[in-house]
UniProtKB/Swiss-Prot annotation:
Main location: membrane
Protein's recorded name: Type II secretion system protein J
Ranges that cross the membrane: 8-28
PROSITE patterns given in the database record: PROKAR_NTER_METHYL
Role according to the record: Component of the type II secretion system required for the energy-dependent secretion of extracellular factors such as proteases and toxins from the periplasm. Part of the pseudopilus tip complex that is critical for the recognition and binding of secretion substrates.
Modified residues (N-methylphenylalanine): F8
Family as reported in the entry's similarity comment: Belongs to the GSP J family.
Subcellular location: Cell inner membrane
Length: 198
């Protein structure tokens, strides 16, 4: 009686190792693709969240706009290209509704606010005082990055206008156009309803 060995042959072992190696490479590739997709999804989600926060901040500001002149300006509302140190559009106005609980802070509830594009960043500028003293510096907040263009259009008297020349009145509506990397142009319309100028 000849006894046969019940182990694996060298060829069978090499074949099993080759299959295991191929499965391992496939698993690592799938894992890398999943991790890359997760990173891209997080980046896009963060970008969309920042865009939504920007438009929410603008909506909060524009919904509280008031027809008020600051001490050093003859206009109620200012908007133009390449103004306020902007690389494109800029807008400046007064708004009500800046919280001052029980009047404890040494300031008004009225705030002067501006938006401008500088170095591919959309900035919001505001002063601590209703009528800032000459030489006062605003608080500058970067509200959105990777912005290529910041455009404004104004609605009044039943039509849209590319420029606002009526310094003594507020427009009825405002169109904000942001050109973003990599999304392109995104437009948002705001209804301007002047509030109380207490």
């Amino acid at each position: 009686m000849i006894r046969r060995s019940s182990g694996f042959t060298l060829v069978e072992m090499l074949l099993a190792l080759a299959i295991l190696a191929a499965l391992s490479v496939a698993a690592v590739t799938v894992l890398q693709n999943v991790m890359r997709a997760d990173t891209l999804t997080r980046d896009k989600s963060g970008r969309m969240q920042a865009l939504q926060q920007t438009f929410s901040q603008m909506a909060a500001d524009f919904s509280q706009i008031i027809p008020r002149r600051s001490r050093d300006s003859a206009s109620l509302f200012f908007a133009g290209r390449f103004q306020l140190g902007s690389d494109d559009g800029a807008i400046a106005f007064s708004r009500n509704g800046w919280p001052n609980p029980l009047g404890l802070l040494p300031r008004s509830e009225i705030q002067n606010v501006s938006y401008r594009l500088r170095g591919s960043q959309l900035e919001r500028l505001n002063y601590d005082q209703q009528d800032p003293l000459p030489g006062s510096q605003p608080t500058v907040t970067i509200v959105l990055r990777d912005v290529r263009a910041f455009g404004l259009r104004f609605y009044a008297s039943g039509r849209w206008q590319d420029e606002w020349q009526q310094a003594q009145t507020l427009p009825q509506g405002l169109e904000v156009t942001l050109t973003l990397e990599p999304y392109g142009e995104i437009r948002r319309l705001f209804l301007l309803t002047p509030g109380d100028s207490r």
